[in-house]
């Protein structure tokens, strides 16, 4: 018990940082329960309602549609707000949507529920856009760079543990309660977990003073008195197109390739496991638990590997390793195969999940994080939107197995691109 306490409350951590770290660990613990229950089984629920590949992809694409339009305004808004308060209130607003999933079986038929879920996720995406940009900025401001690898590693361990427990528990509940009552219970557990995660985010405070800089909107061209030129400059300043003139451009482009390859396959996984492999909810819960068990084991070694390899190379090789999962799924025929590929996929994701956020933060100026993260958020959500809608379409045209193999090859190429040009 003492060793566990020391793992999460390392006495070497300076007192001014310890409180933030503990709340970040509890935040991700509750988020792991949310992810392993409501979020993990949302598309499975939609598939069991009879959702098409397009509708399953749409559930992932809806928040991306919002983020494409709101990421830059969200980044500009966050520049003017206390980042801790902005993260808390956007978390509150976005996570209220999980509660609305619970009564849907009482209100609509199967198709009505599918479209209602799509609309709710669309509305949730509005505050979630600012939350996704703001949390990365809050993490960077509350965790010093020398502690980030350690904190990320522990957060991955905690998330893996809670995800494993909630995935197994969710599969058990769904196998013992009638449809759709079991899913309503799971959505209720997800909402409670989201509320507790948000509660702990409230206590995370920035410790690092941001560097004071002149706002891009305040700078004017003193060699020109043209009002048109000033307006045009302010317009470009608001969009922060200047970021595309920096070395960060290469990072955004390689991540566009990675996330596109990643999200092309994700909706197809649900279709393949439910309609081709005919897995039960317990099978799916066990598979995801095995996936995160290997994420957990990989995370315990993350700090040591990162110290020798670095975030950049670790991200690239992790993405290359992620190509195994879709290719192996295309060759699977039963639950045992699904369990084995889940184990392999978990090790690959442990590398990427631990490294890529820190890799991004290393490439971003400390005094301009929100705007750079907003552009990354646009890249991410463009990939989510395209991949989530194009993946089921291409897999339906090519065949699910061939589509998964091609998507795996694209992941491999994306990893090579990160290593070579990132």
Please name every model-derived segment.
Residues 44-48, 102-108, 163-187, 386-404:
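Transmembrane alpha-helix termini and helix-breaking/packing motifs in multi-pass membrane transporters
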Residues 2-69, 88, 94, 99-102, ...:
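Helix-loop boundary and gating motifs at the non-cytosolic
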Residues 128-143, 351-364:
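Intracellular juxtamembrane helix-capping segments at the cytosolic ends
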Residues 69-85, 174-175, 298-311, 395-396:
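Helix-to-loop junctions at the C-terminal end of transmembrane segments
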Residues 53-54, 145-155, 281-282, 366-376:
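Loop-to-transmembrane helix entry/capping segments in MFS-fold secondary transporters
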Residues 86-101, 191, 313-328, 405-408:
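Structural signature of the two symmetry-related core transmembrane helices
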Residues 2-18, 208-253:
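Juxtamembrane intracellular "pre-TM" segments in multi-pass secondary transporters
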Residues 198-217, 419-422:
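Helix-loop junctions on the cytosolic side of multi-pass membrane transporters
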């Amino acid at each position: 018990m003492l060793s566990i306490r020391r793992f999460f409350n390392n006495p070497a951590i300076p007192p001014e940082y310890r409180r933030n770290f503990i709340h970040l660990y509890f935040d991700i613990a509750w988020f792991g329960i949310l992810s392993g229950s409501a979020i993990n089984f949302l598309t499975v629920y939609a598939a069991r309602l009879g959702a098409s590949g397009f509708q399953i992809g749409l559930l992932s694409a809806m928040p991306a549609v919002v983020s494409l339009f709101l990421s830059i305004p969200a980044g500009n808004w966050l520049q003017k707000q206390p980042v801790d308060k902005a993260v808390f209130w956007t978390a509150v607003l976005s996570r209220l949507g999980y509660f609305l999933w619970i009564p849907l079986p009482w209100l609509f038929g199967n198709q009505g529920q599918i479209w209602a879920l799509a609309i709710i996720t669309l509305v949730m995406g509005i505050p979630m856009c600012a939350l996704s940009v703001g949390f990365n900025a809050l993490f960077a401001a509350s965790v010093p760079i020398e502690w980030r690898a350690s904190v990320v590693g522990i957060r991955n361990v905690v998330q893996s543990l809670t995800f494993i427990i909630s995935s197994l528990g969710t599969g058990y509940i769904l196998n013992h309660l009638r449809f759709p009552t079991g899913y309503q219970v799971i959505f209720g557990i997800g909402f409670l977990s989201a509320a507790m995660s948000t509660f702990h985010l409230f206590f995370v405070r920035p410790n690092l003073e941001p560097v004071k800089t002149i706002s891009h909107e305040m700078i004017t061209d003193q060699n020109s008195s043209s009002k048109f030129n000033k307006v045009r400059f302010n317009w470009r300043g608001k969009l922060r197109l200047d970021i595309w003139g920096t070395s960060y451009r290469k990072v955004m482009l390689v991540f566009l390739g990675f996330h596109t390859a990643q999200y092309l396959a994700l909706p197809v996984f649900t279709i393949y496991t439910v309609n081709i492999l005919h897995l039960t909810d317990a099978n799916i819960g066990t598979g995801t638990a095995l996936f995160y068990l290997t994420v957990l084991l990989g995370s315990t070694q993350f700090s040591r590997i990162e110290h020798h390899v670095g975030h950049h190379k670790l991200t690239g090789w992790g993405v290359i390793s992620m190509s195994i999962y879709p290719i192996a799924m295309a060759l699977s025929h039963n639950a045992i195969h699904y369990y084995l590929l889940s184990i392999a996929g978990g090790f690959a994701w442990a590398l990427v999940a631990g490294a890529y956020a820190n890799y991004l933060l290393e490439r971003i100026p400390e005094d301009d994080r929100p705007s750079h993260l907003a552009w990354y958020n646009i890249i991410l959500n463009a990939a989510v939107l395209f991949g989530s809608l194009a993946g089921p379409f291409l897999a339906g045209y090519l065949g699910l197995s061939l589509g998964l193999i091609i998507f795996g090859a694209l992941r491999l190429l994306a990893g090579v691109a990160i290593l070579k040009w990132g």
